[in-house]
Amino acid sequence: MSAQPVLLFLGAGPKLGTQIPPIFAEAGYKIVLVARSLQDGFQDNGYYHVKADFSDPTSIPEVFDKVKQKVGIPTVVVYNAVQYKLDDPADPFASLAPESVSQFHTAVAVNGTTPLIAVQHAISAFRSLPPTTTGKALIFTGNILNHSQFKNRLCFGIAKTACAYGIRFASVAYAKERFRQAIYPYHLHFLDVHGKRQNGLQFYYADERTTSGMPVMRDIDGTAAGQEYLKLAETSEQLPWLYTYTQDSGYADFGEIDYLKTVYSDEPEHLKGGR
């Protein structure tokens, strides 16, 4: 009998942090929530909480150690933490001036460095799971900034872009860990040397869009994200690493259409805060 799967949810804020985990719990997952506002320990609903501040990348090893000891080895890791300040759209590089560069360091840590360290620890955790374990997926809650430059999101966008590069890199570099391939009519399976089907490591930069391919900003839908993340967690093969999706239709490939037009846009929907 296989062990109960474990969702490690890093960055459990008041929106997605309350909407995504119940979807996994209903699917039979043990749930671990991590945020700086939480206190360590099991909760009445069975969830396990861990306190951590992701502006400090060295917090990640301790989080993984606690989860392994108290709950079990994570089978799915979601990185959802976000922290940044909007830059001055008239002078965005002023955020890197000596008096304000700390906000750049924080944005890069929370949205870039810390999640990439989480990728490394997730890889180590996934490797210790039985080969046939479903999941072994790391999902990063991304946005359009790895494609498009918004005038007041220099620091945030640099961090998101760095993480997107790392996740894409991981999806290629660790593809070999899906073992040798055996092709059958109409199906592609990944098998070990004993002929048993294997589930490989998977990495995703998940990005909800409108039906026209534009960013949803604050309107990101937690239920839709939970459904898509669960779908990614339960597939046995790597889907597109840049997993753009819409609330009603799931995955959609928007390509590069018109993204850079937002660089000079002063339209409110391009300057408002949010993810």
Model-found features: residue ranges?
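Conserved Rossmann-fold cofactor-binding substructure of NAD(P)-dependent oxidoreductases
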Residues: 55-73
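C-terminal helical subdomain
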Residues: 186-275
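Conserved glycine-rich Rossmann-like NAD(P)H-binding loop of the short-chain dehydrogenase/reductase
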Residues: 27-42
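Hydrophobic positions on the long internal alpha-helix
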Residues: 78, 118-122, 166
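Conserved NAD(P)H cofactor-binding loop of Rossmann-fold oxidoreductase domains
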Residues: 78-92
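N-terminal Rossmann NAD(P)H-binding glycine-rich loop of SDR-like oxidoreductase domains
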Residues: 12-23
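Rossmann-fold cofactor-recognition segment
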Residues: 44-59
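Catalytic loop of short-chain dehydrogenase/reductase
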Residues: 83, 95-117, 127-176, 186-193, ...
